[in-house]
Amino acid sequence: MYTSLLVRYGEISLKGNNRPYFEDKLLANMRRALAGLPPRRMRKTFGRVFVELHDDLEAVARRLQRVFGIVSMSPVATAPLELEAIKKAALAVLKDSPGSTFKVQAQRPNKRFPLTSPEVNQELGAYLLTHSQGQRVDVHHPDRVIHVEIRDEGAYIYSRIIPGPGGLPVGVTGRGLLLISGGIDSPVAGYMGMKRGLELTALHFHSFPFTSERSKEKVIDLCRVLAGYSGPLRLVVAPFTNIQKAIRQNCPQEFYVTIMRRMMFRIARAVAAKEEAPAILTGESLGQVASQTLQSMAVINKVVDLPVLRPLVAWDKSEIIEVARRIGTYDISIRPYEDCCTLFVPKHPATKPPLARVEAAEKNLAVVELVAECLENLEILTVEPEADVV
């Protein structure tokens, strides 16, 4: 019955002269998401895309629900510009939609069609009412709306509206380097970055043998979930054990976390340059832990000259957890394997670290050599999406 999927996008249509670039990127991402399914035509019109269906509606919709830039989708039945054919198609859509009340809402961009929109509403409403059992018309609070669009090439009839993730197509705003731990926050930050059009490279700091291989596998699994929204994702694993040992042996305990984060940012700056990523993303939320106070963030930021994006900076933990559950990262994040950020944490870390004292403490470290050693031993992985979303 359904011949195509009507895909709507919102913010993209406001992009003026740049709109074709955004639309082309969206279509490319849609084709990537549908790879492996039968080939199909996609037809772009203003503010929407029609995707051809081959009796595979649910599979197509499930994949496109992970494509940023899509606001919503509707399976569409088509009919020629003949009233009787439109009536029959509308009845089929009505019977396929659950509920006991309905209303018809017609649009008529094709002004050559002999009936006006109100007349189409009346004709179809009367027909549906007499050809369906147990149905009532309710123009104020119907269980479903039967939408009818009368266009030059034919009529499109639909009722079901499937939500999309919204946002911008991945890749239109550049690349960002995501600092990803095994926790709840950073994968959500990555998701939010992708929603604003960023393509991601992920950087994970691994402290073997203090953190196990299972900790690393957890991060790979988190990246696999994120890759379901973007396509294959590059994961850079940085060995961090020697740096943490040096900090523990040579620096005041109250500054462990601050100096550790500054070392991470130095390494991230170098990796970002190699990845051509002009921004760093973190999962920090203001005031959540000692390293996430304004003063700590300011001191940590001093070692990089790139923007540090913190998509979750004003979020409550409950809000972060809600999104983590929805996107499929929460159950992975709570696996009981420590990451390097939970190791060597002092009982009383400084929440307002003075920059001068932190810099003085770092003079006890061979900062350049430690960073260089880490960069020489990076492991680079390509993480594919989960099997059930490709």
From Swiss-Prot:
Record-listed ATP binding positions: 179-180, 204-205, 261, 283, 292
Localisation per UniProt entry: Cytoplasm
Catalytic activity: [ThiI sulfur-carrier protein]-S-sulfanyl-L-cysteine + a uridine in tRNA + 2 reduced [2Fe-2S]-[ferredoxin] + ATP + H(+) = [ThiI sulfur-carrier protein]-L-cysteine + a 4-thiouridine in tRNA + 2 oxidized [2Fe-2S]-[ferredoxin] + AMP + diphosphate; [ThiS sulfur-carrier protein]-C-terminal Gly-Gly-AMP + S-sulfanyl-L-cysteinyl-[cysteine desulfurase] + AH2 = [ThiS sulfur-carrier protein]-C-terminal-Gly-aminoethanethioate + L-cysteinyl-[cysteine desulfurase] + A + AMP + 2 H(+)
Gene3D superfamilies reported in the protein's UniProt record: 3.30.2130.30, HUPs
Pfam family, one: ThiI_fer
CDD domains to which the protein is assigned, alphabetical: PPase_ThiI, THUMP_ThiI
Keywords: ATP-binding, Cytoplasm, Nucleotide-binding, RNA-binding, Thiamine biosynthesis, Transferase, tRNA-binding
GO MF term set: ATP binding; CCA tRNA nucleotidyltransferase activity; tRNA binding; tRNA-uracil-4 sulfurtransferase activity
Chief localisation class: cytoplasm
Annotated EC: 2.8.1.4
GO cellular component, as recorded: cytosol
Domain THUMP: 58-161
Domain of life: Bacteria
GO biological process assignments: thiamine biosynthetic process; thiamine diphosphate biosynthetic process; thiazole biosynthetic process; tRNA 4-thiouridine biosynthesis
PROSITE patterns, per the entry: THUMP
Pathway: Cofactor biosynthesis; thiamine diphosphate biosynthesis
Record-stated family: Belongs to the ThiI family.
Functional note: Catalyzes the ATP-dependent transfer of a sulfur to tRNA to produce 4-thiouridine in position 8 of tRNAs, which functions as a near-UV photosensor. Also catalyzes the transfer of sulfur to the sulfur carrier protein ThiS, forming ThiS-thiocarboxylate. This is a step in the synthesis of thiazole, in the thiamine biosynthesis pathway. The sulfur is donated as persulfide by IscS.
Protein name: Probable tRNA sulfurtransferase
Source organism per UniProt: Moorella thermoacetica (strain ATCC 39073 / JCM 9320)
